[in-house]
Amino acid sequence: MSNDGSKILNYTPVSKIDEIVEISRNFFFEKQLKLSHENNPRKKDLEFRQLQLKKLYYAVKDHEEELIDAMYKDFHRNKIESVLNETTKLMNDILHLIEILPKLIKPRRVSDSSPPFMFGKTIVEKISRGSVLIIAPFNFPLLLAFAPLAAALAAGNTIVLKPSELTPHTAVVMENLLTTAGFPDGLIQVVQGAIDETTRLLDCGKFDLIFYTGSPRVGSIVAEKAAKSLTPCVLELGGKSPTFITENFKASNIKIALKRIFFGAFGNSGQICVSPDYLLVHKSIYPKVIKECESVLNEFYPSFDEQTDFTRMIHEPAYKKAVASINSTNGSKIVPSKISINSDTEDLCLVPPTIVYNIGWDDPLMKQENFAPVLPIIEYEDLDETINKIIEEHDTPLVQYIFSDSQTEINRILTRLRSGDCVVGDTVIHVGITDAPFGGIGTSGYGNYGGYYGFNTFSHERTIFKQPYWNDFTLFMRYPPNSAQKEKLVRFAMERKPWFDRNGNNKWGLRQYFSLSAAVILISTIYAHCSS
């Protein structure tokens, strides 16, 4: 199985990339110029943005089967998995953005009762950032390209999209549908290619935001290059996401828990940034969990061969890395009992789902993110010591999963272990929540997106304050000449008083309720006296 993108894709000439970026920037400024001459720019902009999102929706809808077929060609992903995790999720996201966009684009009123601002009007509006770069990964080549693209469109930006060259069939279909969807020329530009093309995009320094999804290693390169031009970036990375089955988990629910864990660990052949990377099981329930693993695995995969609907590793290097990791472990292994692979598995890039147990923290599988269909299981005794080990070895995972019937245990884990997200009682499924933020913390990335949060990510919040001219009687003390009397007035009118003492205890008094009104009266009196 070979995914050499250069044999299928027409890579964008590096010499043309600067021109493409300039087209994107120019279209944004021309669009804003036209809007500025409208009687109601915000209303016109809303109509434009919603129209583009509607075009994107039908482009995906009309090409859904073609996209699913392309993903199958790229890495043998079965149709149900692509429908569940890519096309349906994406179309729902687009429809949700269209629906909530009128509310999102509406400015927010802010109030401040202190004298300089009490008669003015303060609003916070969300404006487009400008031209943005989206660099998409291979593991969900459609969703992780078009979901941020939809958010960027909703926020009124122009976009340069760099699909993954490792899923070339999907990249071709995505470019074709974007080209034929009826978008204005310059609104969405596609750059096809690999390292050279991506490097040129990052080096141009002309973007207003860079949105990257991928590995922490490349993410650090993206951040470093973005910093040179002070370009903000969002990094959606990964890491070793732990899963807990705690002491106080009902044994009767072990099978359900394992089904949900295996769904996340082996779906997409483990090539998911939020896959359960390893499983931590309390010693009291460990034997029952291990015993049930084989049963659930065989229920999922009653037979396993080259015809099985199981996603392949993306290319031979990923396959070889996964096999080497599995071969290097010192643990015991559980695989589907009826494996029959007659073809060359290296050519197929097919790695069977593998559970590894009887291992410790020093096992090779515990050194870095596996990103393969392998699930190491570690037995633990003390929860606090286990959390200490996670913090020491693999702090700030993208997500943590907890299977426990004790809120005390859940609180202990949540309070101590930082993570981008957390799911209690399931795995992976949280990424499908339409209007919840998805993103990492620390080494698993920064920034987030998803519905409202995606719109915010691709927008800039701008404060607009409008001051009337008739209220100068509340502002005169800021003008020269200065005096001790004005200083006292400023302090009395502007300086808030604490409602707590030096020990942090709250104190009660009427002053905080009446000081503002008294200040306004005093200012008016002094102003009248000074003017006479």
UniProtKB/Swiss-Prot annotation:
Binding site for NAD(+): G214, S215, P216, R217, V218, G219
Pfam families in the record: Aldedh (PF00171)
Predominant place of localization: other
Annotated EC: 1.2.1.3, 1.2.1.64
Phenotype when the gene is knocked out: Results in coenzyme Q deficiency.
GO biological process: aldehyde catabolic process; aldehyde metabolic process; sphingolipid metabolic process; ubiquinone biosynthetic process
Subcellular location: Lipid droplet; Mitochondrion outer membrane; Endosome membrane; Cytoplasmic granule membrane
Active site (catalytic residues): E236, C273
UniProtKB keywords: Endosome, Lipid droplet, Membrane, Mitochondrion, Mitochondrion outer membrane, NAD, Oxidoreductase, Phosphoprotein, Transmembrane, Transmembrane helix
InterPro entries: Ald_DH/histidinol_DH (IPR016161), Ald_DH_C (IPR016163), Ald_DH_CS_GLU (IPR029510), Ald_DH_N (IPR016162), Aldehyde_DH_dom (IPR015590), Aldehyde_DH_NAD(P) (IPR012394)
Note: Present with 2930 molecules/cell in log phase SD medium.
Function: Catalyzes the oxidation of long-chain aliphatic aldehydes to fatty acids. Responsible for conversion of the sphingosine 1-phosphate (S1P) degradation product hexadecenal to hexadecenoic acid. Involved in coenzyme Q (CoQ) biosynthesis, catalyzing the last step in the tyrosine to 4-hydroxybenzoate (4-HB) pathway. Oxidizes 4-hydroxybenzaldehyde (4-Hbz) to 4-HB, the aromatic precursor for coenzyme Q.
Name of this chain's protein: Fatty aldehyde dehydrogenase HFD1
Origin species: Saccharomyces cerevisiae (strain ATCC 204508 / S288c) (Baker's yeast)
